[in-house]
Design a protein with these regions (language model features):
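Early extracytoplasmic/lumenal segment of secretory-pathway proteins
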Residues: 27-94
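Extracytoplasmic ligand-binding site segments that recognize negatively charged/polar headgroups
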Residues: 36-45, 80-82, 86-219
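Ligand-binding "clamshell"
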Residues: 95-103, 115-121, 235-247, 308-311
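Periplasmic-binding protein-like
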Residues: 129-131, 191-200, 237-263, 304-308
């Protein structure tokens, strides 16, 4: 063998060894992702996270968190034990503003099929949920509420009502109840929204603080109509309670992923997130997580779904047209003040 050929062979051998070592390192990496726990995290793991981890060649470890405050503690420690966090998009946007997250690499993560409100410099939405109007059919037999205007019409639709202790989505539905069209919601008229909430407050029997509580209120007939997550009311209906809901004037919110500042697995985390938001993996949501939806609209071109599946998905073309998306960037800039005013209103 000539020296030239020997040199080439040695180079090829070295390159192959380097590639194998790189693959082994990637396969050996463990990403820690922290979510909300419960059935939601279980469903996200099976539907999105594990397939994306397999595609990225990483091992996934899971933790739970209780919001942005726990992320701050992680980052401020200087050595976060979490790599990725799953939050609501409003908190992702706030966390990005506070410098809690690494910038996302949009050369690796593709946003084709994404609404521009569904991602930012430091976060990207990975699933959607809906806040919808639900009611008991044994209470409203002949005529039931169909809009947030009806929710505010206590004379035409008397009954016990419930809203959330969190202002996100509640501020929006108050404006819809005031007659503001869904395409004119932002920037939110917070004065009008708070006025409408003050107006309905005497008829609010319960301010719920968790998804489990909201479902139980409706199931046990403690309230007659309410604002509730679509996935939660679906479980109540599945259990046989006389309940219905509508996607009309629903508020579409996002669950998002972000990489914690100081993570030692940033490159692997970028690759993992790229997999989560890919059309192929997003197309698993309508079948596996009914009443949620993909954030990548290309999922509906990749997947083949039955009419029954599309009827349940909040992001099917028919259902998404009935709703409006939450503006995470508006909440990023106004969250603190609105939360304070809202808490004061519902507590007094």
């Amino acid at each position: 063998m000539s020296l030239k050929r020997l040199a080439i062979a040695n180079l090829l051998g070295a390159a192959t060894a380097l590639l194998m070592a790189s693959s082994a390192m990637a396969a050996g990496e463990t990403l820690t992702i922290s979510g909300f726990g419960g059935n939601l995290q279980k469903d996200l793991r099976a539907t999105l996270w594990q397939p994306a981890a397999d595609a990225a060649g990483v091992t996934l470890s899971e933790e739970t968190q209780d919001g942005l405050a726990s992320v701050r503690v992680q980052v401020q420690s200087g050595s976060p034990t979490w790599d990725i966090v799953h939050l609501g998009a409003d908190e992702c946007a706030v966390g990005g503003k506070e410098g809690l997250f690494e910038p996302l690499d949009y050369k690796v993560i593709k946003t084709d099929g994404f609404d521009k409100k569904a991602y930012g410099d430091h976060w990207i939405a990975t699933n959607t949920y809906s806040v919808v109007l639900a009611w008991r059919t044994d209470v409203y037999k002949d005529k039931h509420p169909t809009s947030w205007k009806d929710f505010w019409d206590v004379k035409a639709f008397p009954g016990r009502r419930a809203l959330s202790t969190y202002p996100q989505e509640m501020m929006e539905i108050a404006l819809l109840g005031a007659g503001v069209s869904k395409d004119k919601l932002y920037p939110l008229d917070t004065k009008l929204s708070l006025e409408k909430l003050k107006e309905i407050k005497p008829d609010i029997s319960v301010w719920w603080s968790s998804g489990a509580q909201s479902a139980q209120l409706l199931k046990d007939k403690e309230v007659d109509m309410m604002a509730i997550w679509g996935s939660r009311v679906a479980s109540v209906i599945k259990d046989g309670a006389p309940v219905e809901f509508t996607y009309d004037n629903g508020i579409l919110g996002y669950g998002c992923l972000a990489i914690l500042k100081g993570s030692t697995h940033v490159a692997a985390a970028q690759k993992f997130i790229a997999g989560v938001v890919s059309p192929e993996i997003q197309a698993r949501i309508p079948e596996m997580m009914p009443y949620y939806g993909p954030t990548n609209s290309l999922a509906f071109k990749v997947g083949k779904f039955s009419p029954e599946v599309l009827a349940k998905s909040n992001m099917s073309p028919e259902n998404v047209a009935k709703q409006t998306f939450i503006d995470a960037n508006w909440w990023r800039d106004n969250n603190e003040l609105v939360r304070e005013d809202y808490s004061l209103l519902i507590s007094n």
